[in-house]
């Protein structure tokens, strides 16, 4: 027989809640004003922000030609401390329209660029990310709240995807088929879709964008990206790096645009825009259903990466120490904020009490600090 951990009452019945409660407790013990300048922002505490081209005051829309921001103001915060780090002036619907106009301008020339050349530009984006990996990983940790090693892992995912896409650019398929007409053959050739919209979530502000962008660009599409509002600095920093590579190759900046803004205005406009042939959305299942319905209603295409309801089943013959370490990180990794987070733990009755006691002990040594969540990996069964 097996028992579900969700049957328990107490601190281990909801693993994500434990982390959230610990974060809230830690926030209450921190002095938010420490390290702030005259602006009231903690920007100067983090030198890597300036190295990524960020400022205390940032514009949130790259239309392919210039940085603009005519929408509402947003304050980027460190979720581990609550301190304000920098400000962002969001784009509005008019800024969005400028992005689309510049994408239209860039579309034909990018489409006609040979796929291996597009792939080489994506490869260069990967190289640029390598040069700024440590700073960008630190920014992801700062703005999203995950540990720095996970932030670095996100950047590496983008780098790996850029490498993969570069190779794929030389393997885009096509066929030569026989024809019933003499001295004729039929050639199959895949064409770019055109303009693409990307909406990414706060919990993986770099990797998800990287997966989409790497493949999208080698296929010859132009794109507009709306990252999550709470990770706007990551979106701006990444876009600056990509725009620099595109400019170095004398290509039109409208290939890859960014418009940070509220989901209710910029996001909804993007979803409803018939000029965007495909929408890639990462977020909750409930919002994903709405996106799918809206886009399919205009005969558009969608790529949806939504929520999960994940379980671990541990039998009595399992390697318990490995299972314990895996369960803790599955529940607490990424501060518990991901679609693959562990929600249900099912244990064989023979190991149930021992495993639960060990898991409670493991949570007691899991520390929440100002900027990182440290997970203890050297754990023993009680």
Give residue spans per PLM region.
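Residue-level signal for inorganic ion chemistry
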Residues: 82, 118, 140, 162, ...
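Terminal low-complexity tails and localization/encapsulation signals of metabolic enzymes
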Residues: 2-87, 120, 124, 172-200, ...
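Short, well-ordered beta-strand elements within core beta-sheets of diverse protein domains
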Residues: 84-91, 106-112, 198, 312-315, ...
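Glycine-rich loop-to-alpha-helix module at the N-terminal edge of alpha/beta enzyme cores
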Residues: 83-172, 183, 362
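Rossmann-like NAD(P) dinucleotide-binding subdomain of oxidoreductase/dehydrogenase enzymes
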Residues: 174-322
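ALDH superfamily catalytic-core signature
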Residues: 241-244, 286-382
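Proline-centered turn/helix-capping motifs that create local helix->coil transitions or kinks
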Residues: 163-178, 247, 365-371
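Short linear capping/connector segments at secondary-structure termini
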Residues: 139-147, 177-182, 373-380
């Amino acid at each position: 027989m097996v028992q579900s951990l969700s049957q328990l009452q107490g601190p281990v019945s909801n693993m994500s809640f434990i982390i959230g409660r610990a974060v809230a407790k830690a926030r209450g013990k921190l002095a938010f004003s420490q390290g702030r300048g005259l602006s009231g922002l903690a920007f100067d505490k983090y030198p890597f922000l300036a190295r990524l081209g960020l400022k205390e005051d940032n514009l949130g829309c790259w239309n392919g030609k210039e940085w603009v921001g005519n929408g509402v103001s947003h304050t980027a915060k460190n979720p581990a401390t609550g301190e304000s780090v920098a400000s962002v002036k969001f784009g509005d619907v008019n800024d969005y329209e400028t992005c689309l106009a510049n994408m239209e301008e860039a579309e034909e020339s990018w489409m006609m660029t040979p796929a291996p050349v597009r792939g080489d530009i994506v490869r260069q984006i990967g190289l640029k990310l390598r040069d700024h990996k440590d700073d960008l990983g630190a920014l992801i940790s700062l703005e999203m709240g995950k540990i720095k090693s996970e932030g670095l892992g996100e950047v590496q995912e983008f780098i790996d995807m850029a490498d993969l896409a570069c190779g794929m650019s030389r393997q885009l398929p096509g066929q030569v088929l026989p024809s019933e007409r003499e001295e004729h053959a039929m050639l199959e050739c895949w064409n770019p879709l055109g303009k693409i919209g990307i909406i990414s979530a706060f919990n993986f502000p770099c990797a998800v964008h990287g997966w989409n962008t790497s493949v999208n660009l080698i296929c010859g599409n132009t794109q507009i990206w709306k990252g999550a509002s709470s990770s706007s600095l990551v979106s701006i920093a990444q876009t600056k790096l990509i725009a620099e590579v595109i400019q170095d190759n004398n290509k039109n900046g409208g290939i890859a645009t960014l418009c940070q803004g509220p989901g209710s205005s910029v996001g909804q406009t993007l979803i409803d825009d018939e000029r965007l042939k495909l929408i890639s959305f990462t977020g909750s299942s409930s919002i994903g259903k709405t996106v799918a319905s809206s886009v399919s209603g205009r005969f558009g295409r969608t790529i949806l990466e939504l929520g999960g309801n994940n379980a671990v089943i541990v039998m009595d013959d399992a390697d318990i120490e490995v299972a314990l370490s895996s369960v803790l990180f599955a529940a607490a990794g990424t501060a518990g904020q991901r679609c693959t987070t562990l929600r249900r733990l099912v244990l064989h009755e023979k190991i149930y009490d021992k495993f639960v006691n060990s898991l409670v002990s493991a949570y007691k040594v899991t520390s929440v600090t100002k900027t990182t969540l440290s997970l203890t990996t050297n754990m023993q069964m009680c």
